[in-house]
């Protein structure tokens, strides 16, 4: 008799995706982040659901409802901080996952890569709207500044902003709709993640060497289930340490001040995971130019497969490209630091240089390095 997991309509799908899936025998810990992102997403949906049971999306009570969750609800504080710091872990895993894709040339799976970019945008939108919900100073002013950027769009900009706001400023209507979208989008992300996996399983996983691994596959279970559990335990360890020892480490103290439309905080800045894009936005003096640069800083990932000029897939055997990749990582860390600094003399220039370098590496230097490496192979 055939095993039920291979015949049952539902079990069959799970079996082909997570149990009998043929996987390359040499994938490293950099391939753990997909499953970690799945864990993060489930954690965020569950903690978010319990928070939504006690949260009220009204400007007069939103701030106090979050305080009520932390003070009066049983284990409300841990749910709230798991959700807030879970978002940080989510983005750490996301950026590692994208970095892995860039380094090992996984972007040659174009469909999977493009769905991944859509996923990235959706998660960023979800996180942004979630940051508005506690209705603190940074929530309110962050929402005001970022939504206001759409007014840079010629002709329809102002109408578009007022349509999103539901009025002439960020107010009750804005908060209510942001809560509605923040609730629904994680399920959209879940559906997109399923499509992401669907496309990935059409081709099979990439591997560090970048060459086909069809001749050397091993079953996903038990080899990679065990490996993924190790990654998951490390993720949970880091998250637990964050939540229990320094839950506000990655947050902004200004968000403990209730939103006040009449007083602007000295430094308006988003959560740490958006700072690199925020730095790119601020480095261009023109409003529309800044908005375009902001969108392109992520959308540029869609152009990466078109600029792949190397004869090799990954960067494992390409030293020049490796140097450029790590320069890109350092550049992104610099941009993240600049995004959190005030708009003053040394920071403005550093931000502009780092922004130029970011686009230069991806659009110009990487393709040139690949051509040079191709020629080195001939010698």
UniProtKB/Swiss-Prot annotation:
One of its GO terms (biological process) is mitochondrial electron transport, ubiquinol to cytochrome c. Heme b b562 binds at residues 83, 182. Keywords: Electron transport, Heme, Iron, Membrane, Metal-binding, Mitochondrion, Mitochondrion inner membrane, Respiratory chain, Transmembrane, Transmembrane helix, Transport, Ubiquinone. It is a multi-pass membrane protein. Its main location: mitochondrion. Binds 2 heme b groups non-covalently. One of its GO terms (cellular component) is mitochondrial inner membrane. SUPFAM superfamilies: a domain/subunit of cytochrome bc1 complex (Ubiquinol-cytochrome c reductase), Transmembrane di-heme cytochromes. Its cofactor is heme b. Coiled coil: none annotated. Heme b b566 binds at residues 97, 196. The chain crosses the membrane at residues 33-53, 77-98, 113-133, 178-198, 226-246, 288-308, 320-340, 347-367. A ubiquinone binds at residue 201. One of its GO terms (molecular function) is ubiquinol-cytochrome-c reductase activity. Belongs to the cytochrome b family. Component of the ubiquinol-cytochrome c reductase complex (complex III or cytochrome b-c1 complex) that is part of the mitochondrial respiratory chain. The b-c1 complex mediates electron transfer from ubiquinol to cytochrome c. Contributes to the generation of a proton gradient across the mitochondrial membrane that is then used for ATP synthesis. Heme 1 (or BL or b562) is low-potential and absorbs at about 562 nm, and heme 2 (or BH or b566) is high-potential and absorbs at about 566 nm. This is Cytochrome b. It comes from Pusa sibirica. The lineage of its organism: Eukaryota, Metazoa, Chordata, Craniata, Vertebrata.
């Amino acid at each position: 008799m055939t095993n039920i997991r291979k015949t049952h309509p539902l079990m069959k799908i799970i079996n082909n995706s997570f149990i009998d899936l043929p996987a390359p025998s040499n994938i490293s810990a950099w391939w753990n982040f997909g499953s970690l992102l799945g864990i993060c997403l489930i954690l965020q949906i569950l903690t978010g659901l319990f928070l939504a049971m006690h949260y009220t999306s009204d400007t007069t009570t939103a701030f106090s409802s979050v305080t009520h969750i932390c003070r009066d609800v049983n284990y409300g504080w841990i749910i709230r901080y798991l959700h807030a710091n879970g978002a940080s872990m989510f983005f750490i895993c996301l950026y590692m996952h994208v970095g892995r894709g860039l380094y090992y040339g996984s972007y040659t799976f174009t469909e999977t890569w493009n769905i991944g970019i859509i996923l990235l945008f959706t998660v960023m939108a979800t996180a942004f709207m979630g940051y508005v919900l506690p209705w603190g100073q940074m929530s309110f002013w962050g929402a005001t500044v970022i939504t206001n950027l759409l007014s840079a769009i010629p002709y329809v900009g102002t109408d578009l902003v007022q349509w999103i706001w539901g009025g002439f400023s960020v107010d009750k209507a804005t908060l209510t709709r942001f809560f509605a979208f923040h609730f629904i989008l994680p399920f959209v992300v879940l559906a997109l993640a399923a499509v992401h996996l669907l496309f990935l399983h059409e081709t099979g996983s990439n591997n560090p060497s970048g060459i086909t691994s069809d001749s050397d596959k091993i079953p996903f279970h038990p080899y990679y289930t065990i490996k993924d559990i190790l990654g998951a335990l490390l993720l949970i360890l880091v998250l637990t340490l964050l939540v229990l020892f320094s839950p506000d480490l990655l947050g902004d103290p200004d968000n403990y001040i209730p939103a006040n439309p009449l007083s602007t905080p000295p430094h308006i800045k988003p959560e740490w995971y958006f700072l690199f894009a925020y730095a790119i936005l601020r480095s261009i003096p023109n409003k529309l130019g800044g908005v375009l640069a902001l969108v392109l800083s992520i959308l540029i990932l869609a152009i990466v497969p078109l600029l792949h000029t190397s004869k090799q897939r990954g960067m494992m055997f390409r030293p020049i490209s490796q140097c450029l990749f790590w320069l890109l990582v350092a550049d992104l860390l610099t941009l993240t630091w600049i995004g959190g600094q005030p708009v003053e003399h040394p920071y403005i220039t550093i931000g502009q240089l780092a922004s130029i370098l970011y686009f230069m590496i991806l659009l110009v230097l990487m393709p040139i390095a690949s051509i040079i490496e191709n020629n080195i192979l001939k010698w």
